[in-house]
Structure formats: C-alpha cells, structure tokens
C-alpha cells in the first residue's frame, strides 16, 4: 500500500499554518526594532540640541534641518500605522475565507463517508451472489467429470481393437511388398529384352539405309545410260532422214563422176567423225543397259528378302511389345490398388496401356497395308508407336521408382520434338509427286532423334553428325551452325534442308507445308499432351493432397483445442478472472468466437471428405482471418490492463510472485506433457491413414475420437490446476486481509503520534503569539520605514490554502471515477476497494485536523487547540474488520481440495 499520501498533506497543512504565523511575528519584531532605532535617534538629537544650546546662534540652521527631519519621520510613522491597520483588515478577511474552507471540507467528508458505505454494501451483495454461482458451477463440473471418465473407458477399449486391425494391415502390407518386388524384377528383365530388340532394329535400319543408297546410285546410272541411248536413237533417226533426202536428190538428177567422188569423200569424213564422237558402239550401250537391269533385279530380290526379314523382326517386336504392355497394365493396376488403399484416390491406370496397345496395333496394320507402296510410311508409323510405348514406359518407371521431376519434364520435351519430326516426315511422304527417296531420307532423319531421346547428350551429337553424312550432295550454303541453336531445333532444320535439297523446292513452300500439317494435327496432339500431363501430374497431385490433409489436420486440432477451452464452464473464481482477462485482451466474445471456429472447422472436414473444394476453404479461411484482425488491438493496451488489474487486486509481488511462478511452471510442464501425448496420437492417426486400404473413414473417426478424449483429459487436468490456483488465491486474499488489519493498526498509531506532534507545535505557536502581544503593547511608537514585504506572506498563505483545497477536490474526483470504473475488480477481491478506503480514511483524518485548527483559529491570536472526536475513524475501521470477519466465516470449503 502507498503510505505517502496523508503524511504529505499533514506536512503541507502544518507548513502553511506555521509559516503564516511565523511571518506575522517576524514582521512585528522588525517593526519594533525600527521603532527602537528611531527612538534612539530622537534621544541622540535631543542630547545634541541640549549640548548646542550655548551655540544657538551658530546652530540655528542645523536646528531647522533637524526639525524638518523630525517632521518627515512623523509622517513615516503615520504611514506605518496605516499599513498596520490594513494588515489587520486583511487578516480578518483571511480568517473568514478559512472558515468557509472548513465548512467545505466538512461537507466533502460527509459525502466521502456516504460513498464508502454504499460501496461496501454493493461489494457484500456481489460477493454473496458470486458464491452461489460458483457452487452451481462446481456441481455441474463434477457431473461432467464422471461422464468423461465413462467415455474414457469406452474409448480405451476401442483403441485396443484398432491396434489389432493395424497389426493385421501391417502383415498384409508386407505380403504386398513381396509381390511388388517380384513384379519389379520381371519388369527389369522385360526392359533388358526390349533394349536388345531395339538394338537389332537399329542395325536393320542402318542396313536398309545402305541398301537404299546403293539403289539410288544404280538408278542414277541407269537414268544416265537411258539418256545416252535416247540421244543415239535421235541421231540415227536424223541420219536416216538425211540419207533418204540425199537418195531422193540423187534419183532426181544423177551426178557426174566428180560429184560421186566428192560425195563418197564426205560420207567417209562423216563416218570418221561419228566414230570419233562415239567411241562406244550402240551394242556396247545395250550391253551396259542389260547389266544394269540385271543388277536392278538382284537388288529388288535382295530388298524383298530384307523386307521379309524385317517383317519377321517387326512381328517379333510387336509380340514383345504386347507382352510388355500387358505386364505394364498389370503393374499399373497393382500400383493403383496400392494408391487407393493408401490415399483413397481412384486412378485409371489401364487407360495409357490401352492407348499404347491400340497405337501399336494400328502401326502393325498400317505396316501390312502400305508395305507394297513404300517402306517409309510403315517405318514412320512404327516409330510413332515405339515412341508412344517408350513414353509410357518412362512414365511407369518414374511412378514406380520415383525419379526427379526435372527428368520427367525433359522426357516430355524430347517426346514433343520427336512427334513434330514424325509429323514433318509424314507430310513430306504424303505430298503428291514425292519420290520414295524422300521417305527414306525422312526415316534416316528421324532415326537419330530416337537415339537422342534414348541416349545421353554425347550420343545425340554423334547422331546429328550422321544426318549430315547421309546427304553427300548437299551444298555448303545449306549448312547450319549448331553452336547458336539448341539441339532439337538443329535436328529439325537439318531435316528441312535435306528435304529442300532433294526436292529442289523453295524454303517458303516447305515451311508452308509444315504449317498446314501442324495446324491439321494440332487438335489431336493437344488432346494427347493433355492426357500425358494428366498422367504425369497424378503423383504430384497425390503428394499435394497428402500435404494439404496433414496441414488441415493440424488446423483442426488447434481449433478444437481453442473451442474446448472456450466452451468449458469455469468452476472457480480465479478461472473466471482469467477468462475475462483473455476476452478483454482479444476483444472476442465467447459466443462469436465459438461460432466462427465451428464454421471454419466444418469447412476443414468438408475439404478432407471431398465435399468442398479449395475455393470454399480459402473463402472460409480469409473470412476467419479478417474477423480476427478486426477484433484485435495492440499489446500496449494489454500491458495497461494488466497494470490496472494488479492495482485493483493489490498484488503482493514480494510474497506471492514466487508461488505464482511455480504454479505457472507446473501448468506449462503439464501442458507440454499433454501436447506430446497429442502429437503421438496424431502420428498414430497419420500412420493409420497411410496403412489402411479400406476402412479409412472409420479409422479417421476413431482416431479423432481418441484425440478428443485426450483433449478432454487435458481440459480436466486444466480444471484441476485452476482449482488449485483458486485455493492459492483465496489463501493469498486471507493473508492480504490480515496484512490490511495490521496496516490499519499502524495507521491508528501514526494518527496518535501525529496528534501528539500537533499538540507540541501548538504550544510553541501559543508562546510565540503571547510574546508578540506583549511586545505589541510595550511598543506604541510608530515605525519609520514601511515595507511591502508584509503582503507577501499573506498572499502565499492564501495561495497555498487555495491550492490545497483544489488538490483535495481533484483527489476526491479521481477517487470517485476510480470507484465507478473499477467495481468488478473490487467485487472479485471481496475487499470493497481497500485502496480507496485507505485514501478516504487518510483524507478524513486530515479533515478532522483541519476542522480542529479552524475551530482554534476563531480568535485573532491564531491559537490551535486539538479536539477529540468520538466515533469517526475508529468506528469506520470496526465496520471494515467486521465485514472481513463475516466474509471469512461465509467461505465454503472446496470439494476438490484433496
């Protein structure tokens, strides 16, 4: 408690009275000294006048001067007497003001006593009402405790049954893992066989490319020989026509011997020129043509044999591909079954395998139908089916083994580039007027791309080199620098330039054909890419859903803990105080908070049960956060509230701080234990959710019931802790009441000592005033020098008295406001505002002293005589102690104390 308010007021009152009396006495003494000095001067002047009577003639001028000085001194003495009368009038005015102040103080004291009595009656009524409410809450909490114990026993039995089911599921999972490992080993063996078959296919591709080059070379030589034969036939026809013309001329007119000799010479010259111009005879050309035709027949026979061997290899490859697709479909079905059992999601795994199977069958039929037309079309379809199956195999491998996502994205990019190249090749082959050479070149261009998608980057650069080597007739103008372009664009540009060189067409025309083909195939490629992205993002979606479900479970646990704390009825006065403090800090009403949390909790459950989407969940979350932000305020207000509450409770930190710290530490330790138990149960819940294939919803509900059971037990423990804290606070209140009684006794002792001190000071003041009266009567001579300092003490006295009155009124106003603002804290303490009562008693003591002084100051001599007042403070303290004793006797023993 603060013991400094009333001694300060006592000292201020004593200082004002003593200083005022002392200043008046000092002024009177000073005036007496001046009168004595003036009397001495007059005596000396008279002596000098007697001495100088003999020298009257010489001292006439000096005598006149002294006479003038005496006249002036008399005037000053009259002025001093006038000032004395004025000061007496002022003192009478101050006495009247003092009487008015005393009357006001009496009125204020009566009003304070009335307010104190009203506050005490209100506090007693509120205390009795709170006791009745606490008793009813204790009875309800006992019933709830019994019900919670029964529920705890039932949930423990259910937990044992669930543990047995978990063990059975673990055994089933081990068996499934063994089957999965066997399937993985068989899949690896099939992959090795597929790699060997692919290698054989590539060897056959290389041989076919060489055969195609040889056939092209032989075709070019045959074309050249055919052109020469046609030229020779034209020359022979021309000669025959000329011979016929000459014969006709000869028949018309027969020449002479000279003309005949001349003509024979010309014919010989023409024959020589013809022999020199054509060293090989037409017979030799016909022999070469026959040889070339025989070679063409042999090459066609070899092509037929190679085609038959290729058909056999393709049939074998198709058989192995079908087996691979079947095993892949089985593996995907098994994987989907595992994922459904672990996460409860439905995936259609057989879709991609069926698509790949259909593509492969379509490629086989296309190969059989178009075998007679061109080998390039069949190879393009076979490459597309192979790329499809290769992509499906990569996707299945990534889903089983779990390769990084960057590799999957790279694979998708490579596959898209290969599809573009295949579409370019198909458009070039399907153009009207294109030769089989173009189809073979397109096959040779797409072959390295497949190598690029299956091998590393170094092998891809080697294949790009082979593309250049396949086109020896290409001009150096068409070469492209590979440093400035990516690998995929480099390969596409090579294929386009080779097609341009072979067909001898413009680049714009080739690009226009490619644009048309891409626009026609755009829709189909978009649908296939969409399906591929769907199959690729299944695993990512499952991971995201798993993470979202975990985070939502955590949010649910936090919200359920908060709602349980808010819905729990407080069973004692201390917990009631704490809950009210929390509501003040956060500005949340319990009903509003519980409704908001229940709505958000329902949204979380709907999201987990797939009844709502992420949009609705995000809306609920944003609304909850907005509500929380709108109902919070700064921590500075919280600190001020805490200080006010501590002042209201008269918190004794030196005595109960260590006890409170120990209790808080115990509460924190027990809360940590409960939190670890909740975390272990949440981990068990997550494990059950991951392991159970069929009974996921039922297991989740049981685990949530177990978690609720644990939270209920935690709430029961918190109730017990709050009850212990309540008992501790009641003991502290009792100790504080005892301490208050001791303080009251010390205040009474100090009041007695104060009265004794005032008696001693009053006797001293009486002696000083008597001395002043004696000196005033003895000194009737006027004062020579009037001073203006006598008005200053009176002004100081009036200013001090007015400031004291204003200060007491302000304190009275503040105490009235504090009473109006803090009735709840006074009711909770059960002491009825002990600090305000303490201040009121101090003010009452000061008012009693002032009233005694005012009664004693009715006489003009300012005599202060103390008077004893019957009742007053002692009766007030007796009332307070009687109420405290009644409150102690009415306390009900706590049933949970043991």
Curated annotation (Swiss-Prot):
Record key words, sorted: Coiled coil
Q: Where is the composition biased (Low complexity)?
A: 434-459
Looking up Pfam families in the UniProt record yields: FPP
Instruction: Mark out the compositionally biased spans (Polar residues).
Output: 460-469
Which InterPro entries does the record cross-reference, listed alphabetically? Answer: FPP_plant
Where are the residues of the annotated region Disordered?
Answer: 429-482, 693-723, 777-835
Ranges of Basic and acidic residues composition bias in the record: 808-822
Q: Give yes or no: UniProt keyword Coiled coil.
A: yes
- The residue stretches assigned to a coiled coil in this entry are 23-224, 287-320, 703-764
Q: Which family does it belong to?
A: Belongs to the FPP family.
Q: How the protein assembles, per its UniProt entry?
A: Interacts with WPP/MAF proteins.
The protein here is known as Filament-like plant protein 7
* Organism field: Arabidopsis thaliana (Mouse-ear cress)
